[in-house]
Structure formats: C-alpha cells, structure tokens
C-alpha cells in the first residue's frame, strides 16, 4: 500500500511539472461557424470559472517500472514524505502562479438593459463583467455623441465600484445605447498565442448597454451605425502602391477610423500595430500571427481585419482557392465574423479582398464567397464589404450575379442610383458618383432588419495636410438603420 502511495505521489509530481497547457487564442473565437463547438452564445459562467477543474485520479506512467540498462532506479519508498509533498506543493504553487501570467484569459463583458424615467438618472449600476483570473478590470465608455458612446444622455463611470450612472437628456424618450470596453490590462500577463504575437490583443471584451428612457423594455431595439471599408495599402514601403511612407500614415488612418462604428480594412499586412496604436474601437480581430513578423510574415497574411464598437465574435479566415501571378504572393481571401447588435442578435459580416484583374479568377473568388454565405449564413442578416477589384462596367463582371444569388443589395447603387445599376459610372476617386472597387453589400435576415440610409466616398477625410491620400484607395462608408429583436424579452 505504501509503495502504491509513493507511485501516486511520483505521478503527481510528473503532472505538476507539466506547467504549460496548450496555448490558445482568447482574443476572439476562431472556430469555423459550422463547428458545433463554436456556438455564438457566450457562456460567462464557464468563462469565469476558477482555474482548474474537477479532480482526476493520478496513475503511474505505463512501463515506468521496467528497469533500463545502466540507469539506477529510484525506489519511491526511499523519498521522505515531507520532502516529496513539499516539492509537489512548491511546483504546484509555481504552476498556479505562472499560468495566470503566461496563459491569462480574457475578461467577460455581458450585455445589460436598464430603464430610467424621462429626464431622470439611474445608478450606480454595476457593470455585468468578470475576469476568470481575478485581475483588476477597468471600464471605458466613449463620450456622448461619439460612435459607441451614448447619444441621448451622459454616462459617468466609477472605476472603484465598477459601476456607471446614466443621466438622460431632458425631453428625450426612447432607446439609447452605449458600448463598454472592459480591460484587464492592469498587470503583467499574456493572453495566450494572441498575446505573445501581439501584446495589445486579448485584454479586452466589449458589451452593449441598452437604456430605455421613459418607457419599458421593448420587443425590438432600433438604432444606427456606420460601416466603412478601406484598403489601407499596408504592404511594406516602398512595395505599397500608396505614395506616402506607411508607418506614420497607417497610424493616422487608425486614428481617423475612430469616427466610425465599424471598419473593415484590407491590406493590413505589415503595420497592424501602427493601425491600432490610436484606435479607440474596443472590439478588434487579432491579425494572423505572421503580420507581426514584418517583413518575413507578409506573404502569409490575408491582411483582413475588423475594428468595431460592437462585439465581434466567431472569426473565420478563408483563403482563395484560385489566384494569379502576384496575387499569389499573399494569402488573399475573406473573413467571416458575427457582429452583436444591441438587443443581442447578430449580423454576419464578411470582409474580402479579391484577386486583381477581374475576369475568371476574380469571379471564382466571388463564387467561393457566395458558396460560403449559402452554407453558413442562410436566413441571416449579412453585410459583405471589401476590395472587390471589379466594377459593373468591367468585361465578364460577376457583381450582379453575386448580389442576386445571395439576395444582396449594393448600398452605393441603392442610395446613389435608386434600383438601377449604372452600366458606366465614372471611375474617379473623389465623389459619391464614382464607382469604387471597394463596395458594401447587405441584406436583412431573421431577427435583424437593415436599411442603408446614406452613402459616402470618404476620400477627402483621409488626405494629409498637403491634400495627398493616405492610401491608394478611397474608403466607402454606409450609414445603416437597424431594427433588431430584443432577445432579453423573448
């Protein structure tokens, strides 16, 4: 019996010595949407459970009792109990101290809904958030009128009590929303693989607080947001097509993106850390690891990322089946993710960068996206943005077929030209009349109704002080009005 006990203790020692668990990306879910394990429903209880799990039995390693020639065997019975237990306790303490540092988990923020009388104040209301590792959290809400901030009231955050007070504007009755960014960047720790390859990733989660002013919670929640798509010319300078040095101007692009609710960027290859340096957008997709290994990793990156005031989840990256010539030097493709609106329902968001040149290869890229949408977004609200490298006037253009087969509407066509697609729109860079290579398609779906209410070619807002563009593309923005089911009252 004593010998078996010693074997168990030695086995425990071996288990404790296995300090590292498999490194995982906690910044955002990366399972394919068809993977049953990648449910879009968050599980804050599981996410905030204590480190460790249920106790499991420990057994000796099979074959450990077989002597090896020339190797002295250690009799477990010769190891004093006190020494062995002290060693196990010491190594367990080391492990428990290291894991929260080298394998920290992202905090969890949950959506909230509160009611306040007309012209009244509610609070302090504690934020519904937790940190699985017990790290101190900070809370940030953007100023009134800013994207993601309250539009019809003032929010005051108390970091000490992890709570907020909301004061409604006089005379306003209706629904107001704001996003809260929850961060555990208050101590030295790393969030898995995302943290090792990008020190700014993995610390944050974001949730929406919905405020019903002068009324009770409703079955639906409506609001507005802006969606921008922008090819930021992020190849290493001077390979980039943009005429300006990329370090400084990529940082300037990131700063100016704060004026929008959601931004899908393409060619975010080599300067991602500069792009997010001045960003206030709390939900950001972690770049593919090679993007941080500039310039070696550039050929292995798709350059596609999303920055958002709404929570973005379930990221899936897909590369093109077909490419031609220099298009094959980088892993162009598309991303799929879900954007959570106030009320809890989600929109499927696609961000793409097709092959240049148009024709069969570009059309094959669009067919690949269409097939993916049909398999993974059936019946759901969808927004597709990106650098399509195609115009309606191009020979063999498949843009019309792409829209029709997926039930999508081109927001530029709808807002600027009514229901008719212009066959020969000007290809200028400045002006809403210009047909850009960069497009935004959308459709409504179960639980979410979308309507494009405005379109803008934002090129003048992305010039430097000399009137030079920060990229060789013009960013396009669409203002959306949404009506989403309130899942909290279903």
Swiss-Prot record:
EC numbers: 3.1.4.12
Signal peptide (UniProt feature, chain positions): 1-31
Summary of the knockout phenotype: Cells lacking this gene do not grow on sphingomyelin as a sole carbon source anymore and replicate poorly in macrophages indicating that M.tuberculosis utilizes sphingomyelin during infection. Moreover, deletion of this gene reduces lysis of erythrocytes by twofold compared with wild-type.
Membrane topology designation: Multi-pass membrane protein
Keywords, in A-Z order: Cell outer membrane, Cytolysis, Hemolysis, Hydrolase, Ion transport, Lipid degradation, Lipid metabolism, Membrane, Porin, Signal, Transmembrane, Transmembrane beta strand, Transport
pH dependency: Is most active at neutral pH.
Catalytic activity: a sphingomyelin + H2O = phosphocholine + an N-acylsphing-4-enine + H(+)
Membrane-spanning residues: 137-145, 162-168, 172-182, 188-196, 205-213
Gene3D superfamilies referenced in this protein's UniProt entry, alphabetically: 2.60.40.3440, Endonuclease/exonuclease/phosphatase
Annotated localization: Cell outer membrane
Annotated phenotype, changing residue 481 to N: Loss of catalytic activity but still able to mediate uptake of glucose and phosphocholine
Major place of residence: membrane
Periplasmic side: 32-136, 169-171, 197-204
Cellular component, GO annotation: cell outer membrane; pore complex
Pfam families recorded: Big_9 (PF17963), Exo_endo_phos (PF03372)
Region annotation Disordered: where it falls in the sequence: 30-49
Any one of the GO BP annotations: hemolysis in another organism
Induction: Rv0888 protein levels are increased by 5-fold after contact with erythrocytes for 24 hours, and by 100-fold in the presence of sphingomyelin as the sole carbon source.
Listed GO MF terms: neutral sphingomyelin phosphodiesterase activity; porin activity; transmembrane transporter activity
Topology, Extracellular side: 146-161, 183-187, 214-490
Effect of residue 353 to N: Loss of catalytic activity but still able to mediate uptake of glucose and phosphocholine
Recorded coiled-coil stretches: none
Entry note about domains: Consists of a surface-exposed C-terminal sphingomyelinase domain and a putative outer membrane-spanning N-terminal channel domain able to mediate glucose and phosphocholine uptake across the outer membrane.
The protein's role, per its UniProt record: Catalyzes the cleavage of sphingomyelin, a major lipid in eukaryotic cells, into ceramide and phosphocholine, which are then utilized by M.tuberculosis as carbon, nitrogen and phosphorus sources, respectively. Thus, enables M.tuberculosis to utilize sphingomyelin as a source of several essential nutrients for intracellular growth during infection. Furthermore, lyses erythrocytes and constitutes the main hemolytic factor of M.tuberculosis.
Name of the molecule in the record: Sphingomyelinase
Organism: Mycobacterium tuberculosis (strain ATCC 25618 / H37Rv)
